[in-house]
Amino acid sequence: MHTPVLLKEMLEILDPQDGKIYVDATFGAGGYTKAILNAANCKVCAIDQDKHTSIFYEELANNFPNRIHFFINKFSQIKQVLLGAQLERVDGVVFDIGVSSMQLDDANRGFSFSKNGPLDMRMSTSNSIDASVFVNTVSEEEIANIIYQYGGEKYSRKIAKAIINFRKKKVIETTGELASIVRSVVSRSKNHDINPATRTFQAIRIWVNKELQELEQGIMCAADLLNPGGKIIVVSFHSLEDRIVKMIFKSLCSDEISLKLNTGFQLINKKIVRPSFEEILNNPRSRSAKLRAILKI
């Protein structure tokens, strides 16, 4: 079961109001959407590129008739999606970035190093390139660079060399094979909290799904869609994502961007909002979550 992270904090900042329209740009299992719909007599446009999430939409649509619209698409396409639904402005957009618990827990999706399955990692099956294409065709130098840049893995060159050596013998087809390759050259950390394959899997997933480009484009499009008083809330899970969110928010708050967009933005929370100790105890996957928010003025 997917447990929404920083749900209470997100709701307090968004402060849903009757008659307003909000966007859940990363619908998933619908946790944020359900909470927003329960908080006020408002409407939610829910977006997710993963077609497997439609089952959760159907359940919410029955419970909240005529108050939720669902679109299978990437959130970088948020502007086109809303214009297609004849919506030009909204009052808030929430992003919960990264892979969901549902995707991690399904071995067939190929996201998890702890469950053996096909090496896929695509959030949308419409993408033609999956993780197996990456590890079996990309050069050693590029593999090393991606794992270092997107995963912060200091052993990226050793891992890349091990991948190349393995694929000379056979095609790398499963998550189990890739995890084993990484473990062959990287030992478990002293605190035992981080699996040796964590950073490599993260980096490849980000590359496959173009997650950082999607994030930047999605936030900028969302900023252009907000009514005055509208908010953008982003929950991210690793430092690379958070740096991008921080950079974009800082840019949106600058005078130069305000003049270009003919509007202004201000930070809602100058300090990062993090999960409480209690939330981390109840949901260990929340431990690295960071929330940032911005207001259109």
Curated annotation (Swiss-Prot):
Is the keyword Protein biosynthesis assigned to this protein? no
Listed under GO cellular component are: cytoplasm
Using the UniProt record, name the top-level EC class of this enzyme in a single word: transferase
One Pfam short name: Methyltransf_5
> Carries keyword Oxidoreductase?
no
| Keywords assigned by UniProt, alphabetized | Cytoplasm, Methyltransferase, rRNA processing, S-adenosyl-L-methionine, Transferase
* Residues where S-adenosyl-L-methionine binds: 30-32, 48, 75, 96, 103
This enzyme's EC code(s): 2.1.1.199
Q: Which SUPFAM superfamilies match?
A: Putative methyltransferase TM0872, insert domain, S-adenosyl-L-methionine-dependent methyltransferases
| Organism superkingdom | Bacteria
Its job:
Specifically methylates the N4 position of cytidine in position 1402 (C1402) of 16S rRNA.
The protein's name:
Ribosomal RNA small subunit methyltransferase H
Name of the gene this protein is made from: rsmH
